[in-house]
Amino acid sequence: MDKSKRPFRKSKRSFRKRLPPIGSGDRIDYRNMSLISRFISEQGKILSRRVNRLTLKQQRLITTAIKQARILSSLPFLNNEKQLERTESIPRTTGTRIRNK
């Protein structure tokens, strides 16, 4: 076949397979904060399986470990650092409220 007759054929490119984010020696545990923190977004949400590139079993173990760490207050439920900075800068008035009748 002539090359002009098959313009939509994909070229075969070599690609490097990425290493898995969890090694065989890593223990998925609620106390392993360095491992758990890799799978949480900046907002404190658990990242999806596609983003993490984990297997289904690994993702389940990571989610339960994150939830256990949250319950034991090792991890916050939400990352509210920006909200705390805003509320600290706003001056609050401490006085009695006057009701309009």
From Swiss-Prot:
Keywords: Chloroplast, Plastid, Ribonucleoprotein, Ribosomal protein, RNA-binding, rRNA-binding. GO terms for molecular function: small ribosomal subunit rRNA binding; structural constituent of ribosome. Its main location: plastid. PROSITE patterns: RIBOSOMAL_S18. InterPro entries: Ribosomal_bS18, Ribosomal_bS18_CS, Ribosomal_bS18_sf. Residues 1-23 are annotated as: Disordered. One of its GO terms (biological process) is translation. The keyword Hydrolase does not apply. It comes from the Eukaryota. It is found in: Plastid, Chloroplast. Belongs to the bacterial ribosomal protein bS18 family. Coiled coil: none annotated. Part of the 30S ribosomal subunit. One of its GO terms (cellular component) is mitochondrial small ribosomal subunit. It comes from Chloranthus spicatus. Residues 1-19 have a biased composition (Basic residues). This is Small ribosomal subunit protein bS18c. The keyword Ribonucleoprotein applies.
